[in-house]
Amino acid sequence: MSAPTIPGLEGNAPTTNQDMLNWIAECAELCQPDKVVFCDGSDEEWEAIAKDLVEKGTLIKLNEEKRPNSYLASSDPADVARVESRTFICSKTEDGAGPTNNWRDPDEMRAEMSEHFKGSMKGRTMYVVPFCMGPITDPDPKLGIELTDSGYVVMSMRIMTRMGKEALDKIGDGPFVKGLHSVGAPLEPGQEDVKWPCNETKYITQFPEDRVIWSYGSGYGGNAILAKKCYALRIASVMAKDEGWMAEHMLILKLISPEGKAYHICAAFPSQCGKTNLAMIQPTIPGWKAEVIGDDIAWLHFGDDGRLYAVNPENGFFGVAPGTNYKSNPNAMKTMEAGNNIFTNVALTDDGDVWWEGLENEPDHLIDWKGKDWTPDEDCLSSHPNSRYCVPIEQCPVAAPEFNDPKGVPVDAILFGGRRPDTVPLVTEAIDWQHATFIGATLASGQTAAAAEAKVGTLRYDPMAMLPFIGYNVGDYLQHWLDIGKKGGDKLPKVFLVNWFRRGDDGRFLWPGFGENSRVLKWIVDRIEGRVDAKKTVVGYTAYSKDIDIDGLDTDPKDVKAALTAPADKWQMDLSDTEDWLKSLGPKVPQEIWDEFDFLKTRIKTANKDGNKALDNMKTK
């Protein structure tokens, strides 16, 4: 079969993959770019695209001495974050998407979006970006191609994925996930471009059965860097369900004991709950070390030994900048020091460096993220709250070598955690995998309904921290978790619920957090090794305060004890919200989850009547 003509392609395509060539030709005919370029991932390509974007004003080259090979982008104020209201799961049936996703008929959506894509790349270059999810050496890799008219996306994809010629060669004549992205800002001949092209109309659309992603109108982060949430979670979660593995919104941490034994921990936290800080934690306990394998996404699969193994499908960190500093996350700061960064929507200093809220040494003058002069007297922030740094993992001083191992690492523990000022103890072990699935399904941040100034319904539920990212029906997703539990049996990792944000009656944080969270991780290791007991509470097996190592810590032991309480009366107040939440997830919520809800109610009733001691004598969970 002869290769199709790709409008705008100079020379021959560096592939013979007929399906790929046909698809690129179709998209080029639809979007009408001036030219089509296959990306090879080289330094020369990076430099050429960066030079072009600097000339257009999209990027500012930072001070080479302070930030080598690094750039600052400032987006349109209307294009600063993921747009969940414009994110669609276009499964073949509405039931396939379920109640937590926006669904549209896939044929109707294709027709509607095709009208927007028609001519959307006029005056621009269509970049063909081949990429590999996870280590390029994986014998069975997950691959993809993103077609985009954004050089910013190409540069970001080079950091966030294994991108370029190697990935294209890996695809060969095989299958791949197809991603089409346009900022939706065509240029007529002679028309001057804007610094950050985008469109008021936005779509971020996944077609899960077809393994296809279409994104239109946004140039920002997760909307445009299609390998991130679109592929690594929404599409991958469907692939995982079909193939018997898991795609989860989890960090992967390697913790090394003083004896040199390594433990691998995955953790799922909703946003603003300290996930990136935990991923790059610096333990404060003598003799303990930590290394990072991933800060955001984990793909979990069963190894030949029957254990769950975790792989990070990404190659970079795409972190929230504000609040990141040498106290909260020194390793992230050191990673950025090495250069090769793309910063987005942070402030520019007078000497060509970057700054954001929470960083040390506030300057007297900045250019803010909107390009305006800024001083500390301003009543606005210098950096957008969702401003970002994008940097290669390999630069992190505590990057574990295993982040490049396609086998992944055996998972010893999974952590769930929200931001709860009350009710949830500092650390609790789940009773079993079914109970763990219930804990994940009802993961929440916020206050109980009876808390000061709180209203009923102020708990924000985020199952497994995956609410915006489950690519199919949430009930089926929970069933998949239960099925994994049945398959894994006694080789499954232990699961824990943590809460770094417990406050006292006076509003103070009871636990110092940050690097001191290593003390909680030590207790988790002690549980894995069977070295410590735990007390049964309404939430599970909660730590005794005496077993949390606070040696050398300037924290009142009474505060630690208070942080480890699970007051049954407070848990009672959560029940109505939790029941409403589970009902809202529809009829596909597995019966086992409702059984766990009934067990929770029984534990609360028993504890309220006879105290926590009575829980030890219960015949049921």
From Swiss-Prot:
Reactions listed under catalytic activity: oxaloacetate + GTP = phosphoenolpyruvate + GDP + CO2
One Gene Ontology term of the molecular function aspect: phosphoenolpyruvate carboxykinase (GTP) activity
Cofactor section: Mn(2+)
Broad enzyme group: lyase
HAMAP family attached to this UniProt entry: PEPCK_GTP
Function according to Swiss-Prot or TrEMBL: Catalyzes the conversion of oxaloacetate (OAA) to phosphoenolpyruvate (PEP), the rate-limiting step in the metabolic pathway that produces glucose from lactate and other precursors derived from the citric acid cycle.
Protein name from the UniProt record: Phosphoenolpyruvate carboxykinase [GTP]
Organism from which the protein derives: Corynebacterium kroppenstedtii (strain DSM 44385 / JCM 11950 / CIP 105744 / CCUG 35717)
Gene (name only): pckG
